[in-house]
């Protein structure tokens, strides 16, 4: 199974009250990224350590209980791709 982890432990996250958007600052590159709710929560799961896609999805299903489970699973898949593309997340070896 592939496990994903954040590329840096020095990422700085900021969630704005009352909104569905958050930002993350990457001090390595100086880049700031805008995150949707699922991407932010995915990162929060990974702050504690690498996880498989299934582990991330289970965590999201607990976090977003009112949402359609199939939609949440698709949103997690999309969030992982966005985070990988942005350089914030990658696969890690066991």
Predicted regions and their residues:
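Long, low-complexity, charged/polar intrinsically disordered regions in eukaryotic proteins
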Residues: 1-30
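Long, charge-rich, low-complexity alpha-helical segments
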Residues: 28-94
